[in-house]
Amino acid sequence: MTNNIAIVTGGSRGIGRAAALKLGAAGYTVVVNYTSNAAAADEVVTSIAAAGGKAVAIKGDVAKDADILALFVAADKLGTLKVLVNNAGVMDQQNRLDEMTTERIRRIFDINTFGSIICAREAVKRMSTKHGGTGGSIVNMSSAAAYHGAPGLGVEYGASKGAIDVLTIGLGREVAAEGVRVNALRPGIIDTEIHDSSGIKGRVKLMRDAIPMKREGTADEVADAIMWLCSDQSSYVTGSIIPVAGGRC
């Protein structure tokens, strides 16, 4: 599997970091995409190498088409793309829609939705047997917010993730006969840095009572689900959206 490539967008922290480490341990050459924190991305690469794996860090903003294209061209030089983890995503401070600026809404969609769609397009061009590929797995990152809508917290975030659900179902069916499987995870309250963006201090702990399992999830637990979707154990699974939310959705 030395020439099999896995791209993880937003791979320098949280769920992306956990997925990158596990993919590296599984034998993939991991392309760790990051936007600004080079030190964090380098730490992931170093950790993968220390465990006997291979990885490179590539800077790129998934809100910019040119950066996405450069990311995939760089990956092409390393081997055959087999896995895309569409993980890059952002949220903003708690707010109502009628108090949001257009710039905020557009930024959320540019990163969470359009970035994921363009990355998926580029992955299909490389994985699909229609284009001479040998198949592969795309794992999109949705959110429990796509289900409950995040009222009063950030409905634009929920909407951006709802679009990911539709992308997953539609694209999963579109390329099912071409060796490409497309699935999504819908994480609930996971203990990662993204919650800091909400502006709610201690948000993860505050949400525990709303979770049937009475605890937050971990990045590793989500990454384990990613690994299953990338493996042959899920070979008959495509166009599916799987909650990883402790029973909350």
For each predicted feature, which ranges?
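Conserved glycine-rich cofactor-binding loop
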Residues: 12-13
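The beta1-alpha1 cofactor-binding region of Rossmann-like NAD(H)/NADP(H)-dependent oxidoreductases
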Residues: 38, 59-70, 102, 220
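Substrate-binding pocket helix/loop in short-chain dehydrogenase/reductase
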Residues: 95-97, 104-109, 207
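A short, exposed helix-loop element centered on a Lys and neighboring polar residues
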Residues: 120-121, 169
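Alpha-helical segment proximal to the catalytic Tyr-Lys
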Residues: 125, 173-177, 235
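Catalytic loop of short-chain dehydrogenase/reductase
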Residues: 133-134, 139-163, 168-177, 189
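C-terminal substrate-recognition "lid" of short-chain dehydrogenase/reductases
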Residues: 215-244
